[in-house]
Amino acid sequence: MKKIFQFITAIAVVAPVAISATSEPLTEAALLTASTISQAMKAMPANAALDQPLRTVDGGTANVGIFIVHRPQEPDQGCTIEHDTLVNDRTTSIFLVLDGAGTLVTGGRLANPVPLSSDDPDLKLVGSGSRGDGIQNGRSRRISKGDVVIIPAGVPHGFSAVEKSITYEVVRIDSGKILPLK
């Protein structure tokens, strides 16, 4: 994960997306244009996993963020999830698949959960929660372009397989207000 965070930082420096940061309460709607989203997608390398924040605003009772996530197919993928499984304590995530397909496992119980530490870079991407070694008794579903998945806070989730690659937009609603405003 630290390599992913370093890569995200490199992308942010090399190919910044034109979005202004603000910590002031919004007095009108925040807009992310199709052009902004397209630029973010083009800046993502095809062979690296990336979770890029585009905009996060103070939504009153929760911070609400829009992210673009890209996951390439990994050579060691099999029928079980052994890494990159999460449960978010106070963040609901809504996935909109933009391109590609994969098998998403949700529900059940996170295997060997370890809370995200305060210095974990993922904390600023997903909010508070735990990472695990897999999901026990979860439900596997194939998702593809155009599909929308709502993952409530407290529901374990992770991909058991990716077909070539998958890119999706994520709306994260963080009632813990850990996601930094951007």
Please provide the spans of the model-predicted regions.
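Bacterial N-terminal signal peptides that target proteins for export
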Residues: M1-I8
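Conserved metal-binding segment of the jelly-roll/cupin
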Residues: R142-P156, S160-V162
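Short, conserved beta-strand element in jelly-roll/cupin
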Residues: D89-L104, G108, S118-R131
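His/acidic/aromatic-lined binding-pocket segments of jelly-roll/cupin-type domains
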Residues: D84-V87, S93-L96, S140-R141, V148-V149
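Short alpha-helix capping/helix-loop boundary micro-motifs
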Residues: D133-G138
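A short, N-terminal "cap"/entry segment at the start of jelly-roll beta-barrel domains
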Residues: I19-D89
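A short hydrophobic beta-strand segment most commonly corresponding to one strand
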Residues: K164-P180
